[in-house]
Amino acid sequence: MNDATPPADELFVTQFLVVSDQERSRDFYQSVFGAAVVRDRDPVILALANTRIVLNVGGGPTDDKPTVRLAPPANPDVSSGFLNLRVRDIAKAYRDWSARGATFLTKPRDHGYEIRAYIRDPDGHLIEVGQTT
Protein backbone atom coordinates (compact mmCIF):
# COMPACT_ATOMS: atom_id res chain seq x y z
CA MET A 1 0.00 0.00 0.00
CA ASN A 2 1.32 3.46 -0.83
CA ASP A 3 0.03 6.65 0.76
CA ALA A 4 -2.72 7.05 -1.87
CA THR A 5 -3.96 3.45 -1.83
CA PRO A 6 -7.12 2.86 0.21
CA PRO A 7 -6.91 0.06 2.77
CA ALA A 8 -7.87 -3.45 1.65
CA ASP A 9 -10.02 -3.82 4.75
CA GLU A 10 -12.56 -1.29 5.95
CA LEU A 11 -10.16 0.05 8.56
CA PHE A 12 -6.42 0.66 8.60
CA VAL A 13 -4.95 2.32 11.70
CA THR A 14 -2.08 4.78 11.38
CA GLN A 15 -0.26 6.81 14.02
CA PHE A 16 0.02 10.58 13.41
CA LEU A 17 2.81 12.36 15.28
CA VAL A 18 3.32 16.12 15.27
CA VAL A 19 7.05 16.82 14.91
CA SER A 20 9.22 19.92 14.79
CA ASP A 21 11.52 18.62 12.04
CA GLN A 22 10.22 16.11 9.49
CA GLU A 23 13.65 15.07 8.21
CA ARG A 24 15.12 14.50 11.67
CA SER A 25 12.12 12.43 12.74
CA ARG A 26 12.06 10.47 9.47
CA ASP A 27 15.76 9.66 9.87
CA PHE A 28 15.21 8.54 13.49
CA TYR A 29 12.37 6.12 12.65
CA GLN A 30 14.29 4.81 9.62
CA SER A 31 17.61 4.28 11.38
CA VAL A 32 16.33 2.96 14.72
CA PHE A 33 13.33 0.86 13.66
CA GLY A 34 13.99 0.23 9.96
CA ALA A 35 10.87 2.10 8.81
CA ALA A 36 10.48 2.43 5.05
CA VAL A 37 9.66 5.80 3.51
CA VAL A 38 6.32 5.79 1.70
CA ARG A 39 6.20 9.57 1.30
CA ASP A 40 9.21 11.83 1.87
CA ARG A 41 7.54 14.93 3.36
CA ASP A 42 4.48 17.14 3.88
CA PRO A 43 3.64 14.80 5.54
CA VAL A 44 6.26 12.10 5.91
CA ILE A 45 4.61 8.67 5.76
CA LEU A 46 6.54 5.65 6.98
CA ALA A 47 5.73 1.96 6.75
CA LEU A 48 6.64 0.19 9.98
CA ALA A 49 5.68 -3.45 10.46
CA ASN A 50 1.95 -3.68 9.71
CA THR A 51 1.07 0.02 9.99
CA ARG A 52 1.98 3.52 8.90
CA ILE A 53 3.37 6.42 10.90
CA VAL A 54 2.59 9.92 9.67
CA LEU A 55 5.01 12.68 10.70
CA ASN A 56 4.01 16.29 10.12
CA VAL A 57 4.71 19.71 11.53
CA GLY A 58 2.16 21.42 13.73
CA GLY A 59 -0.31 24.04 12.67
CA GLY A 60 -3.95 24.82 12.40
CA PRO A 61 -6.68 25.37 12.98
CA THR A 62 -8.02 24.14 9.65
CA ASP A 63 -11.51 24.12 8.17
CA ASP A 64 -12.09 20.51 9.29
CA LYS A 65 -10.77 21.08 12.84
CA PRO A 66 -11.54 24.75 13.42
CA THR A 67 -10.59 24.89 17.11
CA VAL A 68 -7.60 22.54 17.09
CA ARG A 69 -3.91 23.41 16.89
CA LEU A 70 -1.32 20.66 16.48
CA ALA A 71 2.05 20.89 18.24
CA PRO A 72 4.86 18.56 19.31
CA PRO A 73 4.86 17.61 23.00
CA ALA A 74 5.47 20.68 25.17
CA ASN A 75 6.71 18.54 28.06
CA PRO A 76 8.04 15.04 27.28
CA ASP A 77 7.36 13.98 30.89
CA VAL A 78 3.61 14.50 30.42
CA SER A 79 1.86 12.22 27.93
CA SER A 80 -1.72 11.48 26.96
CA GLY A 81 -0.74 8.61 24.67
CA PHE A 82 2.20 6.79 23.17
CA LEU A 83 3.28 4.53 20.35
CA ASN A 84 3.37 0.88 21.48
CA LEU A 85 5.73 -1.50 19.66
CA ARG A 86 5.40 -5.20 20.47
CA VAL A 87 8.49 -7.36 19.92
CA ARG A 88 9.35 -11.05 20.29
CA ASP A 89 12.70 -10.43 21.95
CA ILE A 90 13.00 -7.24 23.96
CA ALA A 91 16.62 -7.91 24.90
CA LYS A 92 17.51 -7.99 21.19
CA ALA A 93 15.41 -4.88 20.44
CA TYR A 94 17.05 -3.06 23.36
CA ARG A 95 20.53 -4.01 22.18
CA ASP A 96 19.94 -3.36 18.45
CA TRP A 97 17.93 -0.15 18.77
CA SER A 98 20.34 1.29 21.35
CA ALA A 99 23.18 0.66 18.91
CA ARG A 100 21.19 2.51 16.21
CA GLY A 101 20.69 5.61 18.33
CA ALA A 102 17.63 4.99 20.51
CA THR A 103 17.93 6.23 24.08
CA PHE A 104 15.88 4.10 26.46
CA LEU A 105 14.60 5.68 29.67
CA THR A 106 15.54 2.49 31.57
CA LYS A 107 16.65 -1.03 30.80
CA PRO A 108 13.72 -3.40 30.12
CA ARG A 109 11.73 -4.12 33.29
CA ASP A 110 9.77 -7.30 34.00
CA HIS A 111 6.18 -6.59 35.06
CA GLY A 112 5.03 -10.21 35.16
CA TYR A 113 2.72 -10.18 32.15
CA GLU A 114 5.20 -8.27 30.00
CA ILE A 115 8.73 -6.96 29.86
CA ARG A 116 8.88 -3.36 28.70
CA ALA A 117 11.01 -0.27 28.29
CA TYR A 118 10.45 3.18 26.84
CA ILE A 119 12.18 5.36 24.26
CA ARG A 120 11.61 9.01 23.34
CA ASP A 121 11.79 10.13 19.73
CA PRO A 122 13.56 13.43 18.84
CA ASP A 123 10.46 15.48 19.77
CA GLY A 124 9.86 13.63 23.03
CA HIS A 125 7.05 11.34 21.87
CA LEU A 126 7.02 8.31 24.16
CA ILE A 127 7.46 4.88 22.56
CA GLU A 128 6.80 1.73 24.57
CA VAL A 129 8.69 -1.40 23.55
CA GLY A 130 7.08 -4.48 25.06
CA GLN A 131 7.36 -8.25 25.03
CA THR A 132 4.47 -10.34 26.33
CA THR A 133 5.66 -13.05 28.73
Regions found by a protein language model. Give the residues of each.
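Vicinal oxygen chelate
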Residues: 1-14, 36-85, 92-120, 131-133
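Short, basic/low-complexity N-terminal boundary segments at the transition from targeting/disordered tails
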Residues: 11-27
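Short, solvent-exposed loop/helix junctions and linker helices
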Residues: 19, 84-87
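Conserved active-site tyrosine of GNAT-family acetyltransferases
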Residues: 25-30, 97, 124
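Short glycine-/small-residue motifs
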Residues: 126-129
